[in-house]
């Protein structure tokens, strides 16, 4: 039997770079919120202990894909602790809607959905803390998708505090370019000393993203989309880009702006949600 699992997008409602560690990683403060929009992971169990990704990504080797890595990591961790039923395996496919290099967390969300879904389907019984710890070894954004609640993040993104920001409507636009995260973080002009503030203070301030100035400078497509959106609503970059978003109080307002968008602007309307669609599906 094939089961389907949501793999939602996220937005960084704000993102501030507060420093850089000796190992090169940047410390930050950011606010994660999920969208009721994303990819769908399809899983069909098999009994021969094998993992097969049926929808490979061009240019990514099977064993290097985050989906496969997540499945194998869960398999090894559960087996090492005697919690993996004999023969546990899976065929996995993905209905992809989220762009790569878009700042919407697609790859991290896919990995988290696989961890949560296979832990349930294989009946391994690992806790959310264990799954989040495993997820962190796959990527800094994976734990927030595993835990499934909007969160204020610090450190390199792994220190999470659940929060409940307003669930607004968003017009999310993709400029048609992919931005590798290192391109932004290695830019010498990236702000790296934004003062650390409490979540209470940050929630009262106007939200912004320290990476936005670099993305707009280096990618004219990002600058063009943001310039257009800012004529209609508060708008900013998510993550390190390339996607940008405008926020609205109602769905109709967001859709009215999307209907006026020029032909070169590709976007969708989605609602911000504080409980991940993945976790809603498991209730």
Curated annotation (Swiss-Prot):
Catalytic activity entry: 4-CDP-2-C-methyl-D-erythritol + ATP = 4-CDP-2-C-methyl-D-erythritol 2-phosphate + ADP + H(+)
Pathway named in the protein's UniProt entry? Isoprenoid biosynthesis; isopentenyl diphosphate biosynthesis via DXP pathway; isopentenyl diphosphate from 1-deoxy-D-xylulose 5-phosphate: step 3/6
Which InterPro entries does this chain map to? Answer: GHMP_kinase_C_dom (IPR013750), GHMP_kinase_C_sf (IPR036554), GHMP_kinase_N_dom (IPR006204), IspE (IPR004424), Ribosomal_Su5_D2-typ_SF (IPR020568), Ribsml_uS5_D2-typ_fold_subgr (IPR014721)
Q: Where is the active site?
A: 10, 141
UniProt keyword list:
ATP-binding, Isoprene biosynthesis, Kinase, Nucleotide-binding, Transferase
Q: Which cystines does this chain contain?
A: none
What is the protein's given name? 4-diphosphocytidyl-2-C-methyl-D-erythritol kinase
Q: Enumerate the residues binding ATP.
A: 99-109
Q: Name one GO biological process term.
A: terpenoid biosynthetic process
Q: What job does this protein perform?
A: Catalyzes the phosphorylation of the position 2 hydroxy group of 4-diphosphocytidyl-2C-methyl-D-erythritol.
Q: Name one GO molecular function term.
A: ATP binding
Which leading EC class covers this enzyme? transferase
């Amino acid at each position: 039997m094939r089961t389907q699992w949501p793999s939602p997008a996220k937005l960084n409602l704000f993102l501030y770079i507060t420093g850089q560690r000796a190992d090169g990683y940047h410390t930050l403060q950011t606010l994660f919120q999920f969208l009721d929009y994303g990819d769908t992971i399809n899983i069909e169990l098999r009994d021969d202990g094998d993992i097969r990704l049926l929808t490979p990504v061009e240019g990514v080797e099977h064993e290097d894909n985050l989906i496969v890595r997540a499945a194998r990591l869960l398999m090894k961790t559960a087996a090492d602790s005697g919690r993996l039923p004999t023969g546990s395996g899976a065929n996995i496919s993905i209905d992809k809607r989220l762009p790569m290099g878009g700042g919407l967390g697609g790859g991290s969300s896919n990995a988290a959905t696989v961890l949560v879904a296979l832990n349930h389907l294989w009946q391994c019984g690992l806790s959310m803390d264990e799954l989040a710890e495993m997820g962190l070894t796959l990527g800094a954004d994976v734990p927030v998708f595993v835990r499934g609640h909007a969160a204020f993040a610090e450190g390199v993104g792994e220190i999470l505090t659940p929060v409940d920001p307003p669930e607004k409507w968003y017009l999310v636009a993709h400029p048609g370019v992919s931005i590798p995260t290192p391109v932004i973080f290695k830019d010498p002009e990236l702000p790296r000393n934004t003062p650390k503030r409490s979540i209470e203070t940050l929630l009262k301030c106007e939200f912004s993203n320290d990476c936005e100035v670099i993305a707009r400078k280096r990618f004219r497509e990002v600058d063009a989309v943001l310039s257009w959106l800012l004529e209609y609503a508060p708008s900013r970059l998510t993550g390190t880009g390339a996607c940008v978003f405008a926020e609205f109080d109602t769905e109709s307002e967001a859709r009215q702006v999307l209907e006026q968008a020029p032909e070169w602007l590709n976007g969708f309307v989605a609602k911000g949600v504080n409980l991940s669609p993945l976790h809603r599906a498991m209730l």
